[in-house]
């Protein structure tokens, strides 16, 4: 297999190399990574080198347990194609699946063995302060519907990031009105199971023309 994937600026070919060890139930996480890449592309940006914040490390809302978290695979896939990953979670202090990925949950059992470009993820640390975590990011993934994320205001997100961002909604957190506000601020929005978002985008575009 060629190693030229490192030269791909937006991960097109790499996304075709889905690790066969990943169960079909985990492909949802890989789709989130694709949506992130596509959202950034729509903004004229590349996933490689982009700063991406994943909001939610735990396996479900309002708990601090990272075991079996779908967010782990999202982070690993995005890191594989060159994204600079950050994480925020109000309930998680340490994400040991990354910090101790050589030995946790047991030596040789980490998901890291199925992905490339994983070495730097041992330095991934959970940020507890959302404004600080957002500073300078280009994409935000709402990966877990923690209470803190349910009423975030688009204007605040853009202010804290310092620029329009790509927003990926994994759990239907964003209402249509909030999505409209993101588009008005120059952001891009993608979501799982929300095919009508493109119509909202066109509606905003036509209203502003």
Task: Give a label for each model feature.
Residues 1-209:
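Structural/interface elements that position substrates and couple domains in central-metabolism enzymes
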């Amino acid at each position: 297999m060629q190693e030229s994937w490192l030269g791909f600026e937006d991960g097109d070919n790499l996304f075709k190399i889905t690790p066969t060890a990943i169960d079909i139930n985990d492909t949802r996480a890989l789709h989130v990574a694709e949506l992130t890449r596509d959202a950034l592309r729509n903004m004229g940006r590349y996933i490689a080198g982009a700063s991406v914040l994943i909001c939610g490390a735990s396996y479900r809302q309002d708990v601090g347990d990272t075991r079996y978290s779908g967010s782990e695979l999202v982070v690993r896939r995005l890191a594989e194609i060159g994204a600079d990953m950050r994480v925020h979670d109000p309930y998680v202090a340490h994400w040991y699946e990354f910090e101790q990925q050589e030995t946790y949950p047991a030596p040789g059992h980490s998901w890291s063995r199925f992905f490339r470009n994983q070495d730097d993820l041992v330095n991934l640390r959970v940020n507890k302060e959302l404004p600080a975590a957002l500073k300078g990011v280009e994409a935000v993934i709402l990966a877990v519907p923690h209470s803190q994320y349910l009423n975030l205001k688009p204007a605040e997100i853009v202010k804290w990031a310092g620029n329009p961002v790509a927003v990926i909604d994994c759990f239907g957190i964003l209402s249509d009105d909030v999505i409209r506000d993101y588009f008005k601020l120059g952001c891009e929005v993608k979501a799982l199971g929300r095919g009508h978002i493109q119509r909202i985008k066109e509606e905003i575009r036509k209203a502003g023309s």
